[in-house]
Amino acid sequence: MREVRKAFEIIPDDQTAPIGYQKIPCHMVFDIKMEDFKRKARLVAGGHKTEAPATITYASVVSRETVRIALMLAALNDLQVKAGDVLNAYITAPCKEKVWTVLGPEFGSEAGKGAIIVRALYGLKSAGAAFRAHLASFMRQMNYTSCKADPDLWYKAETRPDDDTRYYAYILVYVDDILCIHHDAMSVLDRINECLPLKPQSMGDPDIYLGAKLRETRLPNGVWAWGLSPSKYVNQAVQNCQTHLTKKLGGTFKIPAKAANPFPESYSPDTDMTDPLDPECSSFFQHLIGVMRWMVEIGRVDIAVEVSMLSSYLTLPREGHLEAALHIMGYLKQKHNSRLIFDPTYPLIDESDFPEHDWTEFYGDVSEAIPHDMPEPLGKEVDIRMMTDSDHAGCKTTRRSRTGILIFCNLALIQWISKRQPTIETSVFGAEFVAMKHGIEILRGLRYKLRMMGVPLTGPSFVYGDNKSQVTNCSVPESTLKKKSHSICYHAIRESVAMGETRITHISTGDNLADPLTKCTFGAKRRRLLGNILYDLYDDFN
């Protein structure tokens, strides 16, 4: 309680709380941290009693895509990556709300006294935003600038002392977890520690970040790269699932002992007509989907399509859907090891596969929009590749197709998507157009983000699709559109090519790594495609 005492200012016995201040309760919350099984107690304010502030209430949350990009850039530019965790983060910031409370017995001799809450105590609706503003003011004092494409990424131009190379140092903030990328990262953490006290044991090489183990790995080509492994999170999730099935559901449902694939080969969730789940089992199913969606976010690309399919049935799940979710858990129990490596190696791109054409007659003198306020590009340039695919009419009941997208910066997988298309297409040709247009829009946002991070980006993004007709229609100026229903996608993609933002070529279906994100794959094909994305997943087959 010594640390939290500074969050209160005692009201003298002969005075009352100032006019306009609202009385709220405070209570202790006890927990056990699963990372190291330490007991933890935290004093929490009853923020549910107050009105939501008119200003923002969110905390600093850097996007996962930004984290992957930053880790790839760290390896590409040979920079250190160090981590730190702010000690009692929220109470380092001043409180933005007018609230007071009566101190409880945990305050000893001061119990029963009125006190104004002067720090951003956990539980207050404005606590996250207060800490973010407090941290932001210190970042600006250190001459770091918030990235306009991701406000919780801070960057600063630096010079390496050994060769005078200029680059951008980055600080990534995820609530109270700080990741520093710099040629002397510990010195930056030491300076942060002067203003925001960091937990001493947390300062140094990163260990667990966003629920995944973060470590540096030496690849077969001799390159050092950072990788995320969610194995610990996966094992804990499987264990928690087994415990819940036994203690809460009485063993009615079980995790299968063997599951070589996320789904059984004959299973399709959209044709499942089993009985609907009761409210308790429905809540558990929704919880499982939430856990598995986070697994996908931190690197389990191999279950992305199955989790996406089941996510469509959160409002009315059936017994078969829960059994399918448990089958995924059985697969994860068997295949818990995987690593997503952010390899900075430049890919081998044969530009002769991407012939250039004169598009002036069709779209005029168009060019890619370059942000006028982007920082000066520093460091090494990156190459961007995207693979797209679709499964036409994959959903048996709605006839909606599914889009699969993989985006790489150099050889590092940065973004992946498995999602049902919003429209019902009558042909494979149309479904492929919708998928590629979606990918082009994401690429445009990624290129903007890279430029606003100060990453040199001069060439186009290279796009691969496995439908020859669609690729020809997009990449050859004289190709005509036969169906007006595809005109928006048709012109959006072609204009991107005309402005030099993208270049498109054909790739065989067997080599399209986006294929497992459109449909369930099995056997040798699954191992071959996913083995090119995730390390350790199929090592037992090597």
Q: How should these model regions be labeled?
A:
Residues 1-2, 28, 70, 85, ...:
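Mobile genetic element proteins and their domesticated derivatives, centered on retroelements
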Residues 24-30, 82-86, 380-397:
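Two-metal-ion RNase H-like nuclease active-site motif
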Residues 312-316, 383, 422-542:
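RNase H-like nuclease module associated with reverse transcription
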Residues 69-71, 204-351, 508, 518:
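C-terminal reverse transcriptase regions that engage the nucleic-acid substrate
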Residues 134-182, 186-191, 195-202, 295-306, ...:
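Active-site palm subdomain of RNA-directed nucleic acid polymerases
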Residues 1-137, 141-148, 153, 240, ...:
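Chromodomain-type histone methyl-lysine reader module
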